[in-house]
Amino acid sequence: MTSCARGGGSVAGIVADVGTEEGRALTLKRALDALGGLDILINNAGGVRAGRLEATSQSEIEAMLNVDLVAPILLTRAALPALRASGSAMVVNVTSGIALIGAPFYATYAAAKAGLARFGEALRRELKGEGVHVLTVYPSGTDTPMMKTNRAGPELGFGREPASAVADATIEGIETDAFEVIRGGETRAQMIALNRDNPAAVDERMLSMKPALEEAVKDHSAL
């Protein structure tokens, strides 16, 4: 926001919980009041609780599904009239690399993020030719507060890159009307291909690291 303001842009900060109907309505109203219209919606809110499914509470499961899947769908629905009025608008859904390669101890999070990815794909086709494009972003491990309690490193498939790198790639995707932005480099691309062509091999690879991964992510929570 500071960089945008220094560059001459108009910036307005809004504090709201988009996981609630009131928060979504407030966000949209204040954005429209401040900007006079809407050209882009970026669904970037997220929450996670890692761990075995049977050790994850119902409230934690519902919270992840709400903030990672339901809230973006409902906020997009509410924003569509303003986006259509723009004539050339975009919805950007920030999902996760786990939406492409399911990882143990992230079953609900993977389900929510994969659901958001397919929502974006379907909506892109629904809105084709109507002035609203949809971009789906798949970050790899990103150095944000959400990852503070995740102790898994690159040896377990959890590398880190600066949030600024993901932001720059997302901006490039917006400027080029891309369908997808997938982070993680060639290593991630190879794993995606292997998961598609030989999922059993990925199962075996993850089996070998499962004990270490479970220990490393047991406290990973950002809800």
What are these regions (language model features)?
Residues 54, 103-107:
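Active-site loop immediately N-terminal to the catalytic Tyr-X3-Lys motif
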Residues 76, 112:
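Active-site helix of classical SDR
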Residues 44-49:
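Conserved NAD(P)H cofactor-binding loop of Rossmann-fold oxidoreductase domains
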Residues 96:
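Residue(s) in the substrate-gating loop at a strand-loop-helix junction
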Residues 136, 152-190:
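C-terminal helical subdomain
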Residues 52-53, 57-63:
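Substrate-binding pocket helix/loop in short-chain dehydrogenase/reductase
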